């Protein structure tokens, strides 16, 4: 588990779970540079539940396909936990395109989006997905 940015009561907490450490590090830097988010990276999906319990995220960005554990299995563990069941989860994957995501695709009730390749796309995704910002 790698936590970046300074904790603040006004900063939303985002957990990024992906076996690709390059993606989690880049995404963490993008979000951290806004000074609006406290970000935690987890590259071992088998530790995602424990990391989420310790970090108390406001949002979880979760890779859908990982070698050690399927993203849907990880999401099921998180949503069945009494402390975490209300935390929004967004699946991020390289398996769909922006066009395919426009129809509001969901897996097990969770939004599915293509992995953001640009910092502005990532920031927009986080802002749309956070309960405080999305109107959810």
Regions found by a protein language model. Name each.
Residues 55-61:
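Active-site beta3 strand of CheY-like receiver
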Residues 18, 63, 93:
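Active-site residues of response regulator receiver
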Residues 86-96:
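A short, hydrophobic beta-strand element within the central beta-sheet of small alpha/beta folds
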Residues 21-40:
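Two-component/phosphorelay signaling modules centered on CheY-like receiver
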Residues 1-15, 118-136:
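Non-catalytic signal-transmission and effector/linker regions of two-component phosphorelay proteins
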Residues 66:
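Receiver (REC) domain active-site loop signature in two-component systems and cognate sites
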Residues 42-46, 119:
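Conserved Asp/Asn-Gly motif in the active-site loop of CheY-like receiver
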């Amino acid at each position: 588990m790698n936590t970046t940015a300074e904790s603040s009561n006004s900063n939303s907490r985002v957990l990024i779970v992906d076996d690709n450490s390059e993606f989690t590090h880049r995404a963490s830097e993008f979000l951290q540079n806004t000074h609006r988010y406290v970000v935690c990276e987890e590259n071992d999906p088998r530790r995602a539940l424990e990391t989420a319990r310790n970090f108390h995220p406001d949002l979880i960005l979760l890779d859908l396909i990982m070698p050690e554990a399927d993203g849907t299995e990880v999401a099921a563990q998180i949503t069945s936990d009494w402390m975490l069941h209300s935390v929004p989860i967004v699946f991020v994957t390289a398996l769909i395109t922006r066009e395919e995501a426009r129809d509001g695709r969901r897996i097990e009730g969770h939004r599915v989006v293509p992995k953001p390749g640009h910092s502005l796309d990532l920031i927009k995704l986080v802002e749309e997905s956070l309960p405080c910002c999305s109107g959810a």
